[in-house]
Amino acid sequence: MGQEQGTPWILSTGHISTQKGEDGQKTPKLEHHNSTQLMGHYQKTMNQVVMPKQIVY
């Protein structure tokens, strides 16, 4: 199930990257920031998803 949730996240990031791609110059810098933020968000999402699952089990 974790992979399924990861798919929409990647799609969302792609859309954001496309919008910021218009700037061009800011694209590289934003991409680096996005990578770091994405990792943090992914870890937080995973923790939140894992916690309720454990409680249900």
UniProtKB/Swiss-Prot annotation:
GO terms for cellular component: host cell cytosol; host cell nucleus; membrane. Residues 1-30 are annotated as: Disordered. The keyword Cell membrane does not apply. Keywords: Host cytoplasm, Host nucleus. Transmembrane segments: none annotated. Residues 20-30 have a biased composition (Basic and acidic residues). Its main location: host cell. Belongs to the influenza viruses PB1-F2 family. Is not encoded in all strains, and seems to be dispensable for replication. This is Protein PB1-F2. The lineage of its organism: Viruses, Riboviria, Orthornavirae, Negarnaviricota, Polyploviricotina.
